[in-house]
From Swiss-Prot:
Keywords: Hydrolase, Lyase, Multifunctional enzyme, NAD, NADP, Oxidoreductase, Transferase. SUPFAM superfamilies: FabD/lysophospholipase-like (SSF52151), FMN-linked oxidoreductases (SSF51395), Thioesterase/thiol ester dehydrase-isomerase (SSF54637). This is Fatty acid synthase beta subunit hexB. GO terms for biological process: fatty acid biosynthetic process. GO terms for cellular component: fatty acid synthase complex. Residues 1530-1893 are annotated as: Malonyl/palmitoyl transferase (MT/PT) domain. Residues 447-691 are annotated as: Enoyl reductase (ER) domain. The gene is hexB. [Alpha(6)beta(6)] hexamers of two multifunctional subunits (alpha and beta).
Length: 1904
């Protein structure tokens, strides 16, 4: 090996051992599981270190080979021999691993393996055996390891090492062989072997390892098994004690199997949770495993072996040959003491017959380091026996890194000392110190963390719920927890914390005990804590009981600003969860409060000691865990062993000190506790029990205490009062029934007994009692009885209510009753008698009515309502019976007077069965209780010899008292100035706190120390994080300088932080602290100035206040807020406008601003650079982005924040939200526009964590509002100027339909409705309400006055609103808003949002981008130069972690992503952008933006937008965009599209579709006697309309009124357009062979109505764009106008369309079958021929057909150029057209055809066409599609004669004033010209030229 290790190893450990600074031992392993791998281990070692080991291997080979060749009675070696060298050189020749594991083989191999490891180590250290031995304190071997140990104790050179190895090998050989031979035979069957293997016990052998039992349990097990075995030669024995819970039993295999069978009976199954089983009733977590050892070593079975070995050996070894102590493995005796006597028999017997007492031997080693050389993991066995005693174990035969506190072999070779192992007593034991007053105090980890003695009071309901008791404990100087579990509302919890904080010394912190089992409660409680910590309330910690959260949840808790978090685990698994949390947060203090099962109140099923014994080592490996013991404690003598750690010594463990002690129920008898005197007396009288007996309380009262199951399902100790014993009885009889139905059945079957017992014994009596005093159920009680019973049990009569929430509960019941009987009870009554009187007076006789069933359910619901104290009675025997009984059960121990009969025996009084023994004095002051315990501890430590340490006095700090240098920092001194400048190197610069430590030095009470190192400062009695320290603390950057100014005598006068800003070469001071007297301190902040060359500064003043308990920094607050406002006014406000005189109701104007291209370009460039590459390439043009409005309005928006009337600290300003909204019909902003902004405060409200200020602004152009901006600013802090609050906002526009006389009466009875004409009839009208609500508040924060004003208008059928009156409502102290409440009940918002059924976005729904690294460019572009965004020092001083990205910058980035996603290329479609800032965005944060189209509103897309921090998942932006759709057109098709069942799927699916269909159908049935729905659904061929009765006559008259003129002459007659209908007709039948749906008079209204329904559906979904284009194809034009305008009422339009259909249907003569000779056909010229047959060619063809046949043939619809045309004509002409088109499609050279050729093709088909009759069904051709079902040549010249008739009819139906040009201009595209409608002269001229319209001609002449 020497050739492999040429370098010298300077082992620090060896040197320390030689110098006496460390003691070193060596240990060797023996037989065990490693037997199976012993040869492979030797093989691997030889492969690596062959040359080094060659002498030893050869010696071993020669020795063992020779011994194996000797004859032996066993004949064991006759077959294989012992050819070590051959097997190592050729492993394939080696015997099997099972054979090699047998004792004759494994014994010598194990010894050789140990010696090889030892040899390799010495060679690596370049030490000979003598040199190394001289460093050793002693040596030991486990079992056969004693042979190797004896060898190294003897060897002092390499030569003697080989000699000693030979002796050890010979002993090993003969012991292994003789033991194997002497082993009792195995009589175990194959089935039994298989049984052991299947149970995980392994292959049966002569030795069985047992893990998990203590020694007494193992000995008992051995005794029990031996009693079951008939013969002594079959007995088993305890052979090895390896650790406290690891033992090995020796004996015959079949006997050891009997042990396994016994273990199976007591062993817990794998994976079974036993935490809910009492510890002493659990099955053992024990393992049994047979070891691959072939003889029962350390037993009397081998008593003859020693003699046989001695007879065979030819060597000897005496004690005097041992150079170092060799310890015997049973007695621990040093075998050197044998001197000249042979030790051979002793070491042989130590392996064969003597038991191994390994833990005792390890303790006797007395070394600080132990080297384990194997074989196997001997290090683990040593570690288990020595952990906690300061012994470091190094495993030398394992080259892998160490684990579990065991070192790796590299530690021996290291030039640095290996880490020292923990000595639990020394490291964690208590120390005595002298405090600053010279008093002796105890110091532990708990005292260091909490700055309080190591005795605390735990959170406990109800005792530590009351803040005043907690305050008393804290004022006594002790740590205590406020029990949050006793609070059911945020308000009361917060009030208690505030009152507690105000009552305690400022240097003390509050800790709250919270219950994790109630996730809803702990969520709001943590939120309250977060809020109060930010405010500066001295909340430092929480203790979490009833569960252990995950490390991630704890991360969130830590983030709220806590200093420590404690847990109360209830099992070993829970302890491990706490350890996991501590490991996840290694720098954060974690408390572990262990109480076990004997604790008062809630407790586990665990023993106090065993779980800690098993986990103490794991706990102490976490340096951040503070371990506290509780349960059963009450005095000094019983707690001191836990502080000192001596409690574990009696259990054979090293001392295990706890860091502190907690008391719980012990303090319930304290004078300051709110425990009722009767309850205190009962506690004092209770006997209690010792630790050995407490567990019997689970079954029976023990020492006056019983265990019951609490409302949380956990065991809880209480005094065994009558009430608690009834609870226990219910637990067993009722609540143990888990099946809900069976439990309810049992309860009902025992109803009378349960009620009787509740009333007799329990704290919660039965509620139901009638007027006669009988027990009844709730549904049998009257309203009077219910109220009376509630008042009886919940109040103290005239003395108020037991709990304030119960008054609210009673008032809720009163309201239920009032609503039931339609009356309102006076709400001002607060005392129980007053409430009952008012109730009975108002309800009159109704009070004696039995509760309505609905009200019974409501009463039970209000009794269960969250946020209120549960009721003090049981109201029902239902499925909630357990909750009624158990919920909120502890408070009456503090209010015995509230119990029935003031009977304390009814109460539930928590108390520990062990701790109660210590409560012997009634009303003992809590300080005495705690002081007595602490004083006992101090006295005990003094008596033990502990000497108090002397507190070191600290000098006034001066820079020259510190170290000379700091790595990476250049320090220069010039007279009275010291400069620290960071070098620019590749290494990270030093952390600022390292540099500060250097600057401040060791002084603890100088002003610089307090400024830069104190964690807290004080402002107006509030404790706050030190902003000076925060401003300095960060990683200092290269080039930055800290400059220290000194006085002449060397004291520090000023410290300045200087940095170069934004590329400037010169340094600027950004922070300076200075003091000339060491008391008064000035702090100056000078952030960078962007928009001015004049630097802006902000100064603060502090005073160093020195008190008896230490010094503190106090901020001088006068003028502080004014200075901050003045600073921000210089940043934000125009210098030419003074805001000092402005008030909260003032208007604030910005200066007129021109939108300049350069300014906008700079802004958009900054935003663009901050986005992802794909968005940077996005370059929309046109209007100015809506985000830029913030730049234009910034001055006006921020001016209100700087007025004196707004009392706030602008350093705590947060931008909460902003909302940009374009005004209706406003043109988007463009370059060159001149704008001006006016703003005002529209809302000012105080919230628990601060003040919310809403500023609303109007951005105006030419005095017209273009954009409204509403922004919210939140100012963190506590405010009490509630009277300054107000809210002013526009309500949504409401509409109310006055559809009944009742509603009209309701409206007219409202005093707030003031009509211009009070007598106006409102019936049938729809009213629109446009309102503003203004609310003010009083000094208590309640509503002071409510004012609602606005206008009320009549909604006209035209869609316009006509003002008819106003709304005016004003009332002081108004609850709710009566006006808006009325409108919500009886009206509806005009504009409603329609959520999408499937929200989403196809592309670009997720965008990733990175926040800007710096914000200075945005600050300059946006004019928002708030230093919080650009100056880290300023931001940290203000309480932020560092600079944050402007909220509006982030908003602009996110909005740009949305703009890109929706494709708004000209920025004209964004109409609204509303964003809420949910979290801070830090420079370089990765953001993930997600967008989703969620709804439609008034034709606009509503986009939900969220942005998240991609690393943390925290939401930072919640936004909503309102985006116009791209310009949309709505096109309505014409006749020919009808089909049976059309529109019915929508009818069945959507209510708005059904409503319009039904409305149209109802109208046509009433007016014309037919159901359009039936026609659509069934398409009948005939329809007969009867004219009988009044209705029939009216219908006939309606048909007869539909007339036409016989001519255009003045005297022309009117005739009915329905042929054959006369005034005497009794019926009329319509018929159509294809179905009436294909008859024009019915198809037209059906198609038009269906299309209007489709549009209505789109409108209801919110997708109709109000400004969209619309057009209709032929008939569709009527549907388009009907759907998209209000030019004609719906019913009138249906009549018009029906008339049109009738007129067209009857425009032509029909034959006897009702047929005409005409139809229509669609044609596609492109399908005739791709080349040469275009529109012109097709027109020629149509004209040729017309000319050659003389029949009607015209192109009437030009739909798609060259692709779709519609022709009207005679059926024969249409037939010819189809045939010719087919011929042309087949022609090979269509482009060569002449006009004559085309003419010939037409004339070819004329003869055949002449033979056709009008019953022919035209068929589809190559390029033609007949429109079958149409038999009218629409749009053709044949119908021109009907135009004037129809015009005249139309004029009678259209009311010109109803036509609103704005609905038509630019939107409607008429068929006739195909251009958007206009009123311009040019448009009218164009239409006239196309149509030849005479009226238009006259109009044009008039316009001229």
């Amino acid at each position: 090996m020497g050739s492999q290790h040429q370098s010298q190893h300077n082992s620090a450990l060896i040197q320390a051992a030689r110098d006496g600074e460390a003691t070193l031992s060596v240990a060797f392993g023996g037989q065990g599981p490693s037997n199976l791998n012993c040869f492979n281990d030797l093989l691997e070692l030889n492969k690596t270190y062959g040359s080094t080991l060659r002498p030893l291997i050869h010696t071993a080979d020669a020795t063992l080979s020779e011994l194996a060749s000797l004859p032996h009675r066993s004949g064991f070696h006759e077959d294989e021999g012992f050819e070590t060298l051959d097997w190592l050189q050729d492993p394939k020749q080696a015997p099997s691993r099972e054979y090699l594991a047998l004792s004759p083989m494994s014994f010598p191999i194990n010894t050789l393996l140990s010696l090889c490891n030892y040899c390799v180590t010495l060679r690596a250290l370049r030490l000979d055996p003598g040199q190394f031995r001289s460093s050793l304190h002693n040596v030991v071997g486990h079992s056969q390891g004693i042979f190797a140990a004896a060898a190294i104790a003897k060897a002092d050179s390499w030569e003697s090492f080989l000699e000693a190895a030979e002796i050890a090998l010979k002993i090993s050989f003969w012991v292994g062989l003789e033991s194997h031979t002497a082993a009792p035979p195995s009589h175990i069957s194959a089935a039994a072997v298989q049984d052991c293997v299947e149970h995980g016990e392994g292959q049966p052998s002569s030795m069985l390892g047992i893990t998990g039992l203590n020694r007494a349990q193992v000995e008992m097990l051995v005794e029990r098994v031996n009693k079951s075995l008939s013969d002594d030669d079959r007995h088993v024995c305890l052979a090895l004690a390896n650790s406290r819970d690891k033992y090995t039993i020796a004996g015959p295999p079949h006997s050891l199997r009997a042990v396994c069978v016994q273990i199976r009976e007591i062993r817990a199954a794998d994976g079974v949770d036993q935490s809910r089983i009492l510890f002493n009733k659990r099955k053992q977590e024990v393992d049994a495993l047979f070891l691959p050892i072939s003889a029962p070593y350390h037993s009397q079975y081998l008593k003859q072996v020693s003699n046989n070995v001695l007879d065979a050996l030819d060597v000897d070894l005496v004690g005097s040959e041992l150079g170092i102590p060799l310890l015997h493995t049973q007695s621990g005796q040093n075998l050197q003491d044998w001197k000249s006597k042979s030790i051979i028999k002793a070491i042989v017997c130590a392996v064969t017959t003597d038991m191994v007492e390994w833990p005792d031997v390890c303790q006797r080693l007395g070394s600080s380091y132990i080297l384990g050389f194997g074989p196997g993991n001997i290090g683990n066995l040593i570690h288990e026996s020595t952990e906690g005693t300061g012994v470091r174990v190094i495993q030398m035969n394992d080259r892998s890194p160490g684990s579990r506190g065991i070192g790796a072999r590299a530690e021996l070779f290291s030039e640095e000392m290996p880490p020292q192992a923990l000595d639990w007593k020394q490291t964690f034991g208590p120390r005595l110190v002298l405090d600053h007053r010279g008093d002796v105090q105890i110091q532990t980890r708990m005292t260091q963390l909490l700055n309080a003695p190591p005795v605390m009071v735990a959170g406990m309901t109800p005792t530590t719920v009351t803040w005043d008791f907690v305050s008393c404990v804290m004022q006594a100087g002790y740590h205590v927890e406020l029990a949050g579990g006793g609070y059911s509302s945020e308000a009361r919890f917060e009030e208690a914390l505030r009152r507690l904080a105000a009552s305690i010394p400022i240097y003390r912190g509050i800790t709250c005990n919270l219950l994790y089992a109630n996730p809803q409660t702990i969520a709001w409680q943590v939120a309250v804590l977060r809020r109060l910590i930010k405010e500066g309330i001295s909340i430092e910690g929480v203790t979490i009981g009833a569960g252990v959260p995950s490390p991630d949840v704890i991360k969130e808790y830590i983030a709220i600003g806590l200093k420590h978090i404690s847990f109360k685990p209830g099992s070993i698994a829970a302890i491990d969860e706490v350890i996991e949390i501590a490991q996840a947060h290694p720098q954060f203090p974690i408390g572990l409060q262990w109480t076990g099962g004997r604790a008062g109140g809630h407790h586990s099923h665990e023993d106090l000691h065993l779980p800690i014994l098993k986990t103490y080592a794991r706990i102490r490996r976490c340096s951040n865990i503070v371990l506290i013991a509780g349960s059963g404690f009450g005095g000094g003598s019983d707690t001191y062993p836990y502080i000192s750690g001596d409690w574990s010594k009696s259990l054979s463990y090293p001392p295990m000190p706890f860091d502190g002690i907690l008391l719980g129920s012990r303090v319930m008898v304290a004078k300051e506790a709110h425990t009722s005197p009767q309850a205190k007396q009962l506690i004092v009288q209770t006997e209690g029990v010792g630790d050995n007996d407490w567990h019997t309380s689970f079954e029976t009262p023990t020492g006056g205490v019983i265990t019951i199951t609490s409302e949380h399902g956990q065991p809880i100790h209480m005094l065994a009062t009558r009430g608690v014993m009834l609870w226990k009885e219910f637990d067993k009889r009722i609540f143990s029934i888990k099946d809900a139905a069976k439990r309810l059945s049992y309860i009902r079957a025992h109803r009378e007994e349960i009620i009787t017992r509740l009333n007799k014994d329990y704290q919660k009596p039965w509620f139901g009692v009638n007027g006669d005093g009988q027990n009844v159920d709730l549904d049998r009680m009257t309203y009077r009885e219910v109220l009376g019973r509630m008042c009886q049990l919940m109040s103290r009569g005239d003395n108020g209510w037991t709990d304030p929430s119960w008054l609210a509960m009673v008032k809720d019941f009163v309201e239920i009753a009032g609503e039931r009987f339609g009356c309102q009870v006076d709400a001002h009554a607060t005392k129980a008698p007053e409430v009952r009187t008012a109730f009975e007076a108002t309800l009159g006789g109704s009070v004696d009515e039995t509760l309505y069933p609905e009200d019974v359910a409501l009463v039970l619901e209000l009794l269960r309502r969250r946020g209120r104290k549960p009721p003090p009675f049981v109201p029902a025997l239902d499925e909630n019976f357990e909750t009624w009984c158990k919920k909120d059960s502890l408070w009456q121990s503090e209010d015995v007077d509230s119990l029935v009969g003031k009977d304390v025996q009814r109460a539930c009084i928590i108390q520990g069965p062990v701790a109660v023994r210590h409560s012997t004095i009634h009303d003992e002051p809590v300080q005495d209780i705690l002081d007595n315990i602490c004083n006992f501890h101090i006295e005990s430590l003094l008596q033990s010899g502990e000497t108090p340490g002397v507190a070191r006095k600290q000098d006034l700090g001066r820079p020259n008292s510190i170290k000379k240098s700091v790595p990476g920092v250049q320090i220069t001194t010039e007279k009275t100035t010291i400069r620290y400048q960071v070098h620019k190197t590749d290494k990270l610069p030093p952390e600022m706190d390292t540099l500060i430590e250097h600057i401040v030095g060791p002084a603890a009470d100088c002003w610089t120390h307090h400024c830069l190192k104190d964690e807290w400062v004080f402002r107006d009695q509030a404790r706050l994080r030190n902003p000076i320290r925060a401003a300095f603390l960060r990683q200092i950057q290269p080039g930055e300088v800290i400059e220290v100014r000194l006085s002449r005598d060397g004291n520090t006068q000023a410290i300045a932080l200087k940095t170069a800003l934004f590329g400037k070469s010169s340094l600027q001071t950004v922070l300076r602290i200075a003091s000339t007297d060491g008391k008064s301190i000035k702090v100056a902040l000078t952030p960078p100035s962007f928009l001015s060359d004049k630097p802006l500064g902000l100064q603060f003043a502090y005073q160093l206040s020195r008190k008896s308990r230490g010094s503190k920094l106090v901020e001088v607050t006068p003028n502080r807020l004014d200075a901050i406002k003045g600073f921000y006014a210089q940043l934000w406000v125009d210098s030419n406008q003074d805001v000092k005189e402005a008030g909260l109701n003032s208007e604030f104007w910005g200066e007129p601003t021109t939108l300049l291209a350069q300014d906008v370009q700079n802004y958009t460039a900054v935003v663009s650079r901050s986005t992802s590459p794909q968005l940077q390439a996005w370059n929309p043009t046109g209007s100015v982005p809506v985000d830029y409005c913030i730049v234009l309005a910034w001055t006006a928006l921020t001016k209100p924040l700087t007025i004196p009337a707004l009392q706030c600290d602008l350093l705590n300003l947060l931008h909460r939200s902003v909302n940009f909204k374009y005004a209706a019909n406003a043109r988007p902003l463009r370059l060159g526009d001149v704008t001006q902004t006016v703003s005002r405060i529209t809302s000012l409200t105080i919230q628990p964590t601060g003040k919310l200020v809403e500023v609303s602004a109007e951005l105006r152009r030419n005095d017209e509002t273009v954009v409204t901006i509403t922004t919210e600013f939140f100012i963190v802090g506590q405010f009490e100027d509630y009277e300054t609050q107000f809210k002013s906002f526009e309500e949504p526009l409401f509409e109310v339909r006055v559809h009944s006389v009742t509603r009209q009466a309701l409206l007219q009875s409202r005093k707030w409705l003031v009509l211009d004409d009070p007598s106006m009839d409102l019936a049938g009208l729809t009213l629109a309400f446009k309102l503003n609500t203004h609310t003010t508040f009083d000094h208590e924060g309640k509503v002071g006055a409510l004012q609602v004003t606005g206008s009320v208008s009549r909604v006209e059928s035209t869609g316009f609103d006509t003002r008819i009156g106003k709304v005016y409502f004003k009332k002081d102290s108004c609850n709710g808003n009566p006006v808006v409440d009325f409108l919500n009940r009886h009206g509806y918002p005009r504009v409603t949002r329609q959520p999408l059924e499937n929200p989403g976005w196809n592309e670009g729904s997720t965008v990733l981008m990175k926040a800007p690294a710096k914000s200075n460019q945005y600050a300059m572009a946006s004019k928002d130069t708030n230093p919080l965004h650009v100056c880290g020092v300023f931001a940290r001083y203000a309480g932020l972690p560092d600079t944050v990205v402007h909220g509006m910058h982030t908003s602009a980035i996110v909005r740009r992503a949305v703009e890109w996603a929706v494709g708004d290329s000209d920025r004209s479609r964004f109409k609204k952008w509303q964003v809420s800032f949910e979290g801070m965005v830090r420079p370089n944060d990765r953001l993930k933006i997600q967008l989703q189209h969620t709804a439609m509103e008034h034709g606009r897309m509503i986009m939900k937008v969220q942005a998240f921090n991609d690393e943390t998942g925290d939401k930072v932006i919640e936004a909503e965009a309102e985006v116009e759709q791209p310009r949309t057109g709505y096109v309505f098709c014409g006749q020919g599209s009808q089909e049976k069942g059309m529109g019915m799927s929508l009818y069945n699916a959507r209510p708005e579709a059904k409503a319009l269909w039904d409305r149209g159908d109802q109208f046509l049935r009433e007016q014309y006697g037919f159901s359009l729905l039936s026609l659509v659904r069934e398409n009948p061929t005939t329809l007969t309309i009867n004219f009988g009765g009044r209705r029939g006559k009216r219908i006939r008259d309606n048909y007869l009124a539909m007339t036409k003129k016989t001519s255009l002459k003045a005297d022309a007659k009117d005739v009915c357009i329905v042929q054959g209908l006369t005034p005497t007709s009794t019926s009329h039948t319509f018929s159509e062979t294809k179905g009436l749906l294909f008859s024009t008079q019915f198809s037209q209204p059906a198609i038009a109505l269906m299309e209007m329904v489709e549009h209505e559906h789109l409108f209801a979904k919110g997708v109709v764009q109000p400004s969209a284009l619309f057009a209709g194809h032929s008939l569709g034009e009527y549907a388009a106008l009907g759907a998209c305008t209000t030019f004609m009422p719906f019913e009138s339009l249906l009549t018009l369309i029906f008339y049109r259909g009738l007129k067209m249907q009857n425009a032509l003569e029909r034959d006897a079958n009702g047929r005409t000779d005409y139809s229509m056909m669609a044609a596609d010229p492109s399908r005739v021929g791709k080349a040469g047959f275009d529109e012109r060619a097709f027109q020629c063809l149509v004209e040729l057909v017309n000319e050659e046949t003389g029949l009607l043939m015209e192109i009437v619809n030009h739909n798609v150029r060259s692709q779709q045309y519609v022709c009207a004509g005679h059926f024969r002409a249409l037939w010819i057209l189809g045939k010719v088109c087919d011929d042309l499609a087949k022609h090979p050279k269509i482009h060569l055809l002449s006009m004559q050729d085309l003419k010939d093709m037409v004339t070819t088909h004329v003869p055949a066409a002449g033979k056709l009759t009008n019953d022919i069904v035209l068929t589809r051709g190559k390029a033609t599609i007949p429109l079958n079902g149409i038999d009218i040549p629409f749009h053709s010249t044949m119908l021109r004669g009907e135009i004037e008739h129809f015009r005249r009819y139309l004029l009678t139906k259209v009311n010109v004033p109803d036509i609103k040009p704005n609905e038509l201009v630019g939107k409607w595209i008429p068929n006739v010209v195909g251009r958007p409608f206009s009123l311009d002269r040019s448009y009218i001229e164009h239409v006239q030229s196309v149509t030849g319209s005479e009226p238009l001609q006259k109009m044009l002449k008039a316009m001229a």
